[in-house]
């Protein structure tokens, strides 16, 4: 019985930790994991330097009732496209972006308009392979459901 109480306590503590990490730290504080001195670097320059952190995009989505939702996301630039991944429990931004069809994205202080396309099949696998989620990262996120990926195509 005592072991069961400890197990329940550990599971409850882990659940609270995940809620605080996902909801407060990532959801409310929305930190950038990109080093400021690397902003404006190309993907090749980032790789050569090696210590630039995670490239980020600030996505701004306008809903049908004219309200704006802004969220900070990790980005991957590949094959002339910008990719973002919904790999946390909280992914309301993903559904809002799909519903809107177009979003604004700010990268390195440059605001651009993008068309939104869900990624599936071989393209999904190529992007997922370039944005791996290690076990420690999945642990911090509470082992979320399978990721969903969007491709952002820049509009003229």
Residue ranges and their predicted role:
Residues 52-88, 103, 114-115:
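Short beta-strand segments
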Residues 6, 10, 36, 52, ...:
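Residue-level signal for well-ordered alpha-helical segments
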Residues 89-156:
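Short, structured beta-strand-loop surface elements
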Residues 1-2:
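N-terminal Lys/Arg-rich, disordered targeting/topogenic segments
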Residues 22-68:
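Short, conserved active-site entrance elements at the starts or edges of catalytic domains
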Residues 5-23:
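Hydrophobic membrane-insertion alpha-helices, especially the h-region
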